Curated annotation (Swiss-Prot):
The species this protein was found in: Xenopus laevis
UniProt-annotated location(s): Mitochondrion outer membrane
Keywords: Membrane, Metal-binding, Mitochondrion, Mitochondrion outer membrane, Transferase, Transmembrane, Transmembrane helix, Ubl conjugation pathway, Zinc, Zinc-finger
Membrane topology: Multi-pass membrane protein
Catalyzed reaction equations: S-ubiquitinyl-[E2 ubiquitin-conjugating enzyme]-L-cysteine + [acceptor protein]-L-lysine = [E2 ubiquitin-conjugating enzyme]-L-cysteine + N(6)-ubiquitinyl-[acceptor protein]-L-lysine
Broad class of where this protein is predominantly found: mitochondrion
CDD domains in UniProt: mRING-HC-C3HC5_MAPL (cd16648)
EC numbers for this chain: 2.3.2.27
Domain note: The zinc finger domain is required for E3 ligase activity.
Topological domains, Cytoplasmic: 1-8, 261-353
InterPro entries referenced in this protein's UniProt entry, alphabetically: MDM2_MDM4_MUL1, MUL1-like, Znf_RING, Znf_RING/FYVE/PHD
Protein name in the entry: Mitochondrial ubiquitin ligase activator of nfkb 1
Segments in the Mitochondrial intermembrane topological domain: 30-239
């Protein structure tokens, strides 16, 4: 068999790459799975007047992972939008994103490329209060909101500034392989009165209830969706990572199957050649016994390759008889008939009378 039954370079690369990607995707899937499970097990609290009493009765006056839904209210000062009048919030994020086309030397195509060239986030202290203004209840102070993985910001301003094009610039773009399209300016805010779902550690500290990033690797959420929508979103992401893990895992198994099949075929061919060798040796022994040593003459029907041994095998499927077993074994892989140059699928012994 070609390469002595060893896998090809392409098979090795494919197996290594697919196995590594499978391990990576499975690790992400397990992380998502644990996050979904902890989110399902999180305790849900309402912003009622008895919440401080409930927390004071708990060990450490805290809940390691809790769900709170409420409206955003400022503690003291607020942030004003730079571009939209009368738009106030507690978190502001200003971004400048560069859009350009990059020449791909492999596919010979221009591909879209985005890059954040500047981003600034501002925040002021804020609380989560009951959604209805006249409703009685307590407020929860949100700490370190920028550490949330799902920060429910709303895009309130967006403007694209196209790049100025000239003939000299176009020539330079083709020489450098980069063609700027423009800069996109964006402002996002968490506005006053917005309803968000906070998931994190709930702590009672000096009569102040605080929601802060949880410990033990659990995720901190400040999402604009409700709890059910947030949970469904995380489950969808988890399922996608599971599907990707299965797809690349199947690709790894298929590649491994072809590699093992090649090894097995090589092993079967070696066994077949050993059996043929044994049959040829037995045939030669019988011929030597039948012939009189003293009446030896020149070799009849000699091998077309070495001319010193009788032809002893038939090549299939072409049917040519032109070689001894030793010369057949010496043929390079893949083995071809010396006469017609067709591939040799198998051989059968030739018994000379």
């Amino acid at each position: 068999m070609e390469n002595g039954g060893r896998p090809s370079v392409g098979q090795v690369i494919l197996l290594t790459t697919s196995s590594a990607i499978t391990a990576l995707f499975y690790s992400i899937y397990r992380h998502k799975y644990r996050s979904v499970q902890t989110l399902k097990e999180a305790k849900k609290f309402c912003l009622t007047d008895d919440l401080p009493a409930v927390l004071s009765d708990l060990p450490g006056k805290c809940v390691p992972y809790a769900v709170i839904e409420g409206a955003v209210t400022s503690v003291k000062e607020v942030l004003n939008s730079q571009y939209v009048e009368n738009c106030k919030g507690v978190i502001q994020r200003l971004s400048l994103k560069e859009h350009k086309m990059v020449w791909n030397r492999t596919t010979h195509l221009w591909n879209d490329h985005e890059k954040i060239i500047h981003q600034r986030s501002n925040t002021v202290p804020f609380d989560l209060a009951p959604e209805n203004p006249g409703e009685s209840g307590v407020s929860v102070r949100v700490l370190r909101p920028l550490e949330a993985v799902d920060l429910g910001l709303e895009t309130i301003y967006e403007k694209f500034h196209p790049a100025v094009q000239s003939f000299s610039n176009i020539l330079g773009h083709y020489m450098t392989g980069e063609r700027p399209k423009g800069v996109q300016e964006t402002e996002e805010m968490l506005k006053i009165g917005a309803t968000i779902t906070g998931v994190g550690e709930l702590v009672l500290d000096n009569k102040t209830i605080k929601l802060q990033p949880p410990k033990d690797g659990m995720l901190f959420y400040l999402s604009s969706m409700d709890y059910e929508g947030l949970l469904e979103k995380q489950e969808v992401q988890m399922r996608w990572w599971r599907i990707l893990s299965i797809v690349f895992g199947v690709a790894s198994c298929i590649t491994l199957f072809f590699i093992l099949r090649r090894k097995y075929r090589h092993y079967k061919e070696k066994q077949h050649l050993k059996n043929l060798q044994r049959e040829f040796e037995e045939s030669r022994a019988r011929q030597r016994v039948q012939q009189e040593p003293q009446n030896k003459e020149e070799v009849q029907n000699p091998c077309s390759i070495c001319l010193s041994t009788e032809k002893s095998c038939v090549f299939l499927e072409c049917g040519h008889v032109c070689s001894c077993i030793s010369c057949y074994q010496a043929l390079p892989s893949p083995k071809k008939c010396p006469i017609c140059r067709n591939f040799i699928d198998r051989i059968v012994p030739l018994y000379n009378s």
